[in-house]
Amino acid sequence: MIKGVEGEITEISGNEVTLKAGQFYLNILCSTNTIKELSLSAKVHLLTYLSFSADRAPEIYGFKDRAEYNVFLMLLKANKIGPKMALKILSATSPEMLQKMIASKDISGLSRLPGLGKKTAERLVSELYDLVKDYAVEFPKELSDVSEDAVGALTALGFDMTSAKLAVNEVLKEQTVENTQELVRKALRKLNKTR
């Protein structure tokens, strides 16, 4: 198996790059996260996954970031998730956020990702939870009622559960808040910065 390739980027098109490695030109499929970090003529090292299938030519998947590579491999452990679907999922969110969604059992947030419906999201949680449970987002005990109300308000505004929990936790770590309204307002500022 090819664990990685090193060479010069000669073309970027959609989610595919062409990399010149010695005398070879390799077409490598990448997530949007990896594509954003690449530029033409740049010399790069990509971690790779080689996929074989009876009904199509071999495909190489490339990752600039080890965390994304590891989450890609983790996704392949789930039933009915192939490399193309795993790449599509990783193109829609960060590896860290995906792990937090699975660990927090955020079915709603997961099912909003492209290609994932409610059943697939539930399957991901049931099959991969043990691998990511340390990433679960929890609230400090003393403010859990206010925090839960704030998360409820943020999800009603259209934010996914995991993003809402992360924003609320960040606010609570940085400063004290008087009530739910103040917490929602400050969390909204954080969420709007990341959009």
From Swiss-Prot:
It is found in: Cytoplasm. Has three domains with a flexible linker between the domains II and III and assumes an 'L' shape. Domain III is highly mobile and contacts RuvB. Residues 1-64 are annotated as: Domain I. Homotetramer. Forms an RuvA(8)-RuvB(12)-Holliday junction (HJ) complex. HJ DNA is sandwiched between 2 RuvA tetramers; dsDNA enters through RuvA and exits via RuvB. An RuvB hexamer assembles on each DNA strand where it exits the tetramer. Each RuvB hexamer is contacted by two RuvA subunits (via domain III) on 2 adjacent RuvB subunits; this complex drives branch migration. In the full resolvosome a probable DNA-RuvA(4)-RuvB(12)-RuvC(2) complex forms which resolves the HJ. One of its GO terms (biological process) is DNA recombination. Belongs to the RuvA family. One of its GO terms (cellular component) is cytoplasm. The RuvA-RuvB-RuvC complex processes Holliday junction (HJ) DNA during genetic recombination and DNA repair, while the RuvA-RuvB complex plays an important role in the rescue of blocked DNA replication forks via replication fork reversal (RFR). RuvA specifically binds to HJ cruciform DNA, conferring on it an open structure. The RuvB hexamer acts as an ATP-dependent pump, pulling dsDNA into and through the RuvAB complex. HJ branch migration allows RuvC to scan DNA until it finds its consensus sequence, where it cleaves and resolves the cruciform DNA. One of its GO terms (molecular function) is four-way junction helicase activity. NCBIfam families: ruvA. Residues 65-137 are annotated as: Domain II. Keywords: Cytoplasm, DNA damage, DNA recombination, DNA repair, DNA-binding. Its main location: cytoplasm. This is Holliday junction branch migration complex subunit RuvA. Residues 137-141 are annotated as: Flexible linker. Residues 142-195 are annotated as: Domain III. InterPro entries: DNA_helicase_Holl-junc_RuvA_I, Hlx-hairpin-Hlx_DNA-bd_motif, NA-bd_OB-fold, RuvA, RuvA_2-like, RuvA_C, RuvA_C_sf.
